[in-house]
């Protein structure tokens, strides 16, 4: 993040009379909880992003057992760079995973030869886009936004919902 949210948090806290607590997690603690995050997910996931969320819920659980979440607001209201950056809109693939060749290299050589990651991703991307209903009245820009919204809601958002639910429930914390 280019700027801290503290100014806005304090402003909201003052005007809405809410009670906020700051949770600071350091790098060694993030690393310590990587395995727990992987267990919570039942597979490797987003590494430190998962462990930080798991630790966040662990700390919040000390005060309460259930919470409303703002998860998916960016997906619904177009808060990600791929909703407005031309290079992302015109990437021809899922905009949050443009670096397919780098991901292919993560596979061991035997699996890498058997799995054509690019072909699979292209297939799923095009299959998903074929389900998007473009209106006759849509401008090209609106059609692209409609496509990117569909991809985000049906792929990216589902991943985040699953991730949040698993990290919370690992701590006995419930999200709504």
Model-assigned labels for residue ranges:
Residues 1-145, 160-176:
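ATP-dependent adenylate-handling active sites, centered on carboxylate activation for C-N bond formation
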Residues 157:
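Catalytic donor/gating beta->alpha subdomain of glycosyltransferases that bind UDP-sugars
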């Amino acid at each position: 993040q280019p700027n801290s949210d503290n100014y806005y948090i304090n402003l909201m806290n003052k005007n809405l009379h809410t009670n906020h607590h700051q949770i600071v997690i350091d790098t060694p603690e993030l690393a310590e909880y990587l395995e727990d995050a992987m267990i919570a997910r039942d597979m490797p996931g987003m590494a430190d992003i998962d462990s930080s969320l798991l630790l966040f819920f662990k700390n919040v659980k000390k005060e309460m057992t259930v919470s409303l979440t703002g998860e998916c607001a960016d997906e619904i209201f177009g808060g990600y760079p791929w909703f407005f950056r031309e290079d992302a809109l015109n990437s021809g693939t899922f905009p949050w995973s443009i670096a397919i060749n780098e991901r292919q290299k993560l596979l061991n050589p035997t699996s890498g030869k058997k799995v054509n990651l690019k072909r699979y991703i292209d297939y799923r991307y095009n299959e998903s886009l074929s389900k998007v209903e473009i209106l006759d009245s849509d401008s090209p820009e609106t059609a692209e936004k409609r496509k990117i919204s569909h991809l985000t809601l049906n792929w990216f958002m589902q991943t985040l919902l699953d991730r949040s639910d698993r990290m919370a429930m690992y701590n006995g914390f419930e999200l709504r």
